From Swiss-Prot:
Name of the protein in its database record: Ethylene-responsive transcription factor 2
DNA-binding region, residue intervals: 116-174
SMART domains cross-referenced by the UniProt entry: AP2
BP term (GO), one: induced systemic resistance, jasmonic acid mediated signaling pathway
Protein task: Acts as a transcriptional activator. Binds to the GCC-box pathogenesis-related promoter element. Involved in the regulation of gene expression by stress factors and by components of stress signal transduction pathways. Involved in disease resistance pathways.
Comp. bias (Low complexity): 192-206
Example of a GO cellular component annotation carried by this entry: nucleus
Species whose genome carries this gene: Arabidopsis thaliana (Mouse-ear cress)
């Protein structure tokens, strides 16, 4: 027990302080008895003379009692004065990583290109024209017509090319030529329709102009006749008055 309470130097220091404060024994002395919770406390401080009516003695006694009051189940008194060193671990600084905004992936719209056929070109208003170069005319272009779809225009080119070059012709649809398929139907071009509409409008406007001029001439002749009649009547009246 005494080996476990290896704090004699601390006890001696406290004892010297207590004796200095008390200054000797008196009549009313308070001695620590066996009821002290620690046997080490009893063995070391049981012989100290403390006066009950002295406030300083009571203060020292209270301090000593509080200092050595611990759990009786513990046999190691070194916990009162010998605290284990606390290892201070460095705190890790967690820096919040800034999330970079995700770059918007540009949606690349793959433009679907229309298939290009030999001898076919698209008109500005959406129709498809077919033409071919005639080797007999020094490569001059021969107009084959305008069609609703590019396939019809390509078929018209194939028919004309096969007629000009025979089996040596480069065709868009080799299997469709001479297969009994009917020829593609041409459509009237925009220019022809516009010219026909303009000619019809011009003829109608010219007819309207002729009709207006005819009506004006009729009105003028009627007015002239009326004036002549009035003049004739006035001359007759004058002759009658003179006579």
């Amino acid at each position: 027990m005494y080996g476990q309470c290896n704090i004699e130097s601390d006890y001696a220091l406290l004892e010297s302080i207590t004796r200095h404060l008390l200054g000797g024994g008196g009549e009313n002395e308070l001695r620590l008895n066996e009821s002290t919770p620690s046997s080490c406390f009893t063995e070391s401080w049981g012989g100290l003379p403390l006066k009950e009516n002295d406030s300083e003695d009571m203060l020292v006694y209270g301090l000593l009692k509080d200092a050595f009051h611990f759990d009786t189940s513990s046999s190691d008194l070194s916990c009162l004065f010998d605290f284990p060193a606390v290892k201070v671990e460095p705190t890790e600084n967690f820096t919040a990583m800034e999330e970079k905004p995700k770059k918007a992936i540009p949606v690349t719209e793959t433009a679907v290109k229309a298939k290009h056929y030999r001898g076919v070109r698209q008109r500005p208003w959406g129709k498809f024209a077919a033409e071919i170069r005639d080797p007999a005319k020094n490569g001059a272009r021969v107009w084959l017509g305008t069609f609703e779809t590019a396939e019809d225009a390509a078929l018209a080119y194939d028919i004309a090319a096969f007629r000009m070059r025979g089996s040596r012709a480069l065709l868009n649809f080799p299997l469709r030529v001479n297969s009994g398929e009917p020829d593609p139907v041409r459509i009237t071009s925009k220019r022809s329709s516009s010219s026909s509409s303009s000619s019809s409008s011009s003829t109608s406007s010219s007819e309207n102009g002729k009709l207006k001029r005819r009506r004006k001439a009729e009105n003028l002749t009627s007015e002239v006749v009326q004036v002549k009649c009035e003049v004739g009547d006035e001359t007759r009246v004058d002759e009658l008055l003179v006579s």
